């Protein structure tokens, strides 16, 4: 229904409303021309044709204006509105495209991070499993060696011959290593090439006759002396006492490294060394300072001291060695023992110090079992450093003490009094303190701080949960509660 024009020139009700409300850009006849412009104005859609649509809108709206000044605000609003919508849509598309390109590398980096974490977790689990197996193997081989020596002493007591015989088995260390190399390595090398590669532990020129005599002789003597004193101690003391006293070598290694190699001073290791010395004195006191007990303790402490000196000199002159270099070096010690130290058991045999009736009377089963377990112990110690954490190897060594104690109790060869038990525990605790890393205090502080942060976070979460619960209850009851946090 048409409405007649009013005296003030307003033709329709819509024009009246627009005039009363003060619509920006109002001009007379706006409502009558609006219907014609709706059909001609096209909405802007995102795409390359958006600017052309803007120009068509301006061309179609320009005849509607009565004057240039009255139509300018409308054109400006129309163009701004349309360009704003189009621009926002185009910006959204471009942003979504940019976000898509940015999320792809982020997602790929997240996938790589997850893969790396999975691999690290898998390697950690494998190292732990290997560590547990090697702990059992190391402790079992050391306990077996000690107990077989005690059994052999019942019918055959020639400690130096037993030491010489077991040291000769070290020659098989490198062949065992090379067999593992052939079984696991992708690029296999010849025995001579691998031998030359591993001989770099002696220097860039490899193993020469001069280096063979200069470097191998002192280490071979220390190796033989360590094992010989250990076997002598087993004649005077029980297997539990000797294995516990031998654990003092960690304390002696620290003291020698601190004095000779100028290693870092650590108070906790000084405490461990004092505990080891205390355990030694208590072990001698356990039998009321009996003559055999004191001599046995001296032999065991001497074995631990020569073992510590061997390790410190190895670190000083040869440095660190990988598994192949260690296998080469131990096999070289076996060759040196076979060539240059064989005259010693011969002299002891003819001087009746270590004499046996015939070679057929020798307990070959016990001798081969002792030598095989000793070789297995040395191989496991060097393999364990490659497959798992070195600290687990040391734990396997200290676990030989309760292992020997269990066997001695079953054989009823030892009676544990309070002093002997306390001495054994003190030495084992000192050994474990020696295994603490150099940054153990910083690691402990970090761990304590992380625990405090977790507790504070849990406390804040509990407070927020309580406040949310109180709010919900107050809303149900129609009251307003003040949040606690």
Swiss-Prot record:
Extract one GO cellular component term from the record. membrane
Q: Does the keyword Secreted apply?
A: no
How this chain sits in the membrane, per its record, is: Multi-pass membrane protein
Biased amino acid composition, Basic and acidic residues? 88-98
Location of the protein in the cell:
Membrane
Q: Where is the composition biased (Polar residues)?
A: 32-42, 50-64, 99-111
Membrane-crossing segments per the record: 129-149, 156-176, 217-234, 241-261, 265-285, 294-314, 329-349, 359-381, 383-405, 414-434
Annotated keywords: Membrane, Transmembrane, Transmembrane helix, Transport
Q: EamA domain: from which residue to which, for each copy?
A: 225-285
Top-level taxon in the UniProt lineage: Eukaryota
In residue numbers, the region (Disordered) covers 32-64, 78-111
The family this protein is said to belong to: Belongs to the SLC35F solute transporter family.
What does the record give as the function of this protein?
Answer: Putative solute transporter.
Q: What is this protein called?
A: Solute carrier family 35 member F4
Q: Which organism is it from?
A: Mus musculus
